[in-house]
């Protein structure tokens, strides 16, 4: 869901469109190659997003080192990503810190929940995505990323 939201926000912003590439991958390989969960797609549809995400991918060392910024959903993901990175210039950001700075809270995984939990997760992802695109606009003119 985060990929779809962020792709949408970047595409809508002329200062970012064509300059920021959005991809996504998981820190575990459970769902590699699988399409998006139907409940996630439903939440995106209800919110008016076109859910054209790519099949699930795995965030291995090669994948991660090719990115400037990696946005993680949980503290465990931050740890996993940092363990795999060899490119130390890649910045790892906990998404929820963009919405609630300094609290170091995870984005709750709605996988075992109902539609309401997917909708709540999507709302958080939208807020984080808006903050992230704001940071990207600033970053394109600066060397630091605040999160």
Q: Which functions belong to the PLM regions below?
A:
Residues 1-147:
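Short polar/charged helix/loop
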């Amino acid at each position: 869901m985060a990929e779809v939201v962020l792709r949408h926000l970047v595409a809508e912003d002329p200062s970012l469109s064509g300059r920021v590439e959005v991809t996504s991958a998981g820190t575990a390989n459970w769902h590699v190659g699988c399409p998006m969960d139907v409940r996630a797609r439903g939440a995106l549809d209800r919110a008016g997003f076109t859910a054209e995400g790519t099949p699930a991918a795995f965030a291995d060392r090669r994948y991660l080192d090719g990115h400037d910024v990696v946005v993680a959903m949980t503290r465990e993901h931050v740890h996993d990503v940092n363990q795999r990175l060899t490119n130390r210039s890649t910045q790892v950001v906990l998404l929820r810190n963009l919405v609630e700075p300094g609290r170091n809270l995870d984005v709750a995984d709605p996988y075992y929940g109902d539609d309401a939990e997917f909708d709540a997760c999507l709302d958080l992802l939208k807020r984080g995505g808006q903050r992230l695109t704001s940071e990207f606009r600033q970053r394109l003119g600066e060397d630091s990323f605040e999160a």
